Amino acid sequence: MRVVIQRVKSSQVTVNGKIVGQIGRGLNLLVAIATTDTENELDWMCRKCLELRLFPADGQSDRPEKSIQDIDGELLVISQFTLYGDCRKGRRPSFSDSAPPQVAQHLYEKFVEKLRQSGLRVETGVFGAMMEVSIQNDGPVTLLLEREASGSIMDNG
């Protein structure tokens, strides 16, 4: 599982000209599910997204001291299978490491459900749709989180 996590002042996602998800201060999460992922990876990734200290303390330095939960921030979660694009061969990315849509959608929805259990406001895009994402980055702060399925070749514990 891969998540690109971005600290934002605001973010919104539009499908067919209609805003389907919009947040203020918080985190924009671009989420990709691998062929080897199971529900086991979701708990770790959810906890990491909610607990990473990416926000400065109010009135303090820019040093990140607070998590999204500490600031009662908002989350915009967008599915993005292209995070598993393999560009090592040829001129067209291979997406063979991305989970099939039906598997990915199930795990994506479970991930969103787990994030919502935090009590924070969680908005989403539309799984599988062509989306326009507008982001006002804050910092910018952008990180790539990765958690491979237990027992897979790339397991990073």
Curated annotation (Swiss-Prot):
Its main location: cytoplasm. Gene3D superfamilies: D-tyrosyl-tRNA(Tyr) deacylase. It catalyses: glycyl-tRNA(Ala) + H2O = tRNA(Ala) + glycine + H(+); a D-aminoacyl-tRNA + H2O = a tRNA + a D-alpha-amino acid + H(+). A motif (Gly-cisPro motif, important for rejection of L-amino acids) lies at residues 139-140. Pfam families: Tyr_Deacylase (PF02580). The keyword Acetylation does not apply. The keyword tRNA-binding applies. GO terms for biological process: D-amino acid catabolic process. It is found in: Cytoplasm. Its EC number is 3.1.1.96. One of its GO terms (cellular component) is cytoplasm. One of its GO terms (molecular function) is tRNA binding. CDD domains: Dtyr_deacylase. InterPro entries: Daa-tRNA_deacyls_DTD, DTD-like_sf. Keywords: Cytoplasm, Hydrolase, RNA-binding, tRNA-binding. A Gly-cisPro motif from one monomer fits into the active site of the other monomer to allow specific chiral rejection of L-amino acids. Homodimer. An aminoacyl-tRNA editing enzyme that deacylates mischarged D-aminoacyl-tRNAs. Also deacylates mischarged glycyl-tRNA(Ala), protecting cells against glycine mischarging by AlaRS. Acts via tRNA-based rather than protein-based catalysis; rejects L-amino acids rather than detecting D-amino acids in the active site. By recycling D-aminoacyl-tRNA to D-amino acids and free tRNA molecules, this enzyme counteracts the toxicity associated with the formation of D-aminoacyl-tRNA entities in vivo and helps enforce protein L-homochirality. Belongs to the DTD family. NCBIfam families: D-aminoacyl-tRNA deacylase. This is D-aminoacyl-tRNA deacylase. It comes from Gloeothece citriformis (strain PCC 7424) (Cyanothece sp. (strain PCC 7424)). The lineage of its organism: Bacteria, Bacillati, Cyanobacteriota, Cyanophyceae, Oscillatoriophycideae.
